[in-house]
Each structure stands twice: as structure tokens, then as C-alpha cells.
């Protein structure tokens, strides 16, 4: 049975033992995709940040907290998968330093002109999908070559949707990218558009996340079938 990897939910980047940076991702789309993939006959492993939603019983779930932990788990699991869907919303930045004790007002830099403002130094976290994209096995017509892997990313954009999404697709070496908007965050419905590497819109899907997930899995299967037909070894 072919196995796919799904990243899901937010991540947390702690400032101290109490406070952390995060976002409003609920993990609902990841859970819906996991169920849809199981229904389609895939074996499913989910790498999930902290969420309240329940994943389907048939899926293996690997719980993580930080972006670094999510990347490590995904990189370990991806080699045994035929593809991966990046439905998670990992934090893009982490604090430069994590305090061992709850921070006080004097623990961050204040300038004389700050008027009570704190300066929080952040560093970029690793890009999980780009890391997977850099290691994925490409599809090949060579019958002796290992089977290829596919990669599908999500892109939440508020402007220049196509341009920004395609830039992400290319930078992360993905095969498809799913463009959604902020209204889907922490909601039960979603409005998405699937783009391929040429910028062509393969589908526009709206509705309950359960239904959207089923359509997404079907579109991915159709894409992979077409790619496989062009590469008989996979």
C-alpha cells in the first residue's frame, strides 16, 4: 500500500516556558486530508503540531511542537512515502534565544527611545517543504530507477495569489501548490485553487473541508497517474 505524508496544524516557538509564537491553524484540513487519503487506499502518516482536532484512527500520527521538530520528523518519514502534502502552517520565525525562566520586563532589549516597546530578535526557521523538495526522488522513464515522489504545498496568500504561489512552488521544488485564503484558517470551510508548475489552474474547489480534501486527493491522484503514464517505471 502506497504511503503518503501529511504535515498538519501549527507549530509553536517558545519565548520562555509559558509564552510562544504560533498561529491560528486548527489542523482541520490536515485531518480531512488524512481521512480522504485513507478512503482512497493510501497508508497515511501525519506529522502534527499541537491541535485539538482528532485524526482518523487509521492514520499514524507523529506529534511535534516546533518547526524544527516537524522538519526532523518529516525528513525521517519522507523517504518511505510516495508523496507528501504540506497542509501545516509552521512558524516561519523563532526567538533568537529561549529563556529558561518566565521572562520579565527586563529580559529583552529596550532602547531609550522605545517608549515601553520591547525588541524581540527572531531568526528564520527551516522551510519544511523546501527541505523535502530538495531530497525528493524525481520521476524517471528509466525502469531501473527508484520510483518518483510528488510534493504538494499549501500557500495562504492575501494578494498576488498566483505569482506568490508559483514562486513558492518553484522555490520548494513542489509539483502542485494549493492556494487558499485567510478565511480558511480555523474554519470548517475552505476555498482553494490548485496550480501546477506551469501556472495552470487544475481545479478550483469550495466547500466543507471534508469535501475539499476529497477533491484534492482525487486531483493529486489524477496528476500522479498522468505523470506515471509518462514514466512507465513509477
What kind of feature is each model-predicted range?
Residues 1-234:
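A cross-family phosphate/adenosyl-ligand binding-site feature
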Amino acid at each position: 500500500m502506497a504511503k503518503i505524508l501529511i504535515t498538519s496544524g501549527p507549530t509553536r516557538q517558545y519565548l520562555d516556558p509559558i509564552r510562544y509564537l504560533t498561529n491560528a491553524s486548527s489542523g482541520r484540513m490536515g485531518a480531512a486530508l488524512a481521512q480522504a487519503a485513507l478512503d482512497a487506499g493510501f497508508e497515511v502518516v501525519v506529522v502534527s503540531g499541537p491541535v485539538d482536532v482528532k485524526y482518523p484512527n487509521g492514520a499514524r500520527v507523529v506529534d511535534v511542537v516546533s518547526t524544527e521538530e516537524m522538519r526532523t520528523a518529516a525528513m525521517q518519514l519522507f523517504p518511505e512515502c510516495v508523496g507528501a502534502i504540506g497542509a501545516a502552517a509552521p512558524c516561519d520565525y523563532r526567538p533568537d534565544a529561549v529563556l529558561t525562566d518566565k521572562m520579565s520586563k527586563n529580559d529583552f532589549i529596550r532602547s531609550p527611545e522605545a517608549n515601553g516597546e520591547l525588541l524581540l530578535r527572531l531568526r528564520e526557521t527551516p522551510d519544511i517543504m523546501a527541505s523535502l523538495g530538495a531530497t525528493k526522488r524525481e520521476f524517471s522513464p528509466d525502469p531501473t530507477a527508484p520510483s518518483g515522489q510528488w510534493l504538494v504545498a499549501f500557500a495562504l496568500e492575501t494578494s498576488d495569489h498566483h505569482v506568490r504561489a508559483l514562486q513558492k512552488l518553484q522555490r520548494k521544488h513542489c509539483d502542485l501548490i494549493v492556494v487558499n485564503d485567510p478565511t480558511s484558517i480555523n474554519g470548517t470551510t475552505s476555498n482553494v485553487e490548485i496550480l501546477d508548475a506551469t501556472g495552470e489552474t487544475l481545479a478550483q474547489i469550495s466547500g466543507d473541508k471534508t469535501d475539499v480534501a476529497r477533491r484534492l486527493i482525487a486531483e493529486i491522484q489524477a496528476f500522479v497517474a498522468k505523470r506515471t503514464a509518462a514514466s512507465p517505471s513509477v
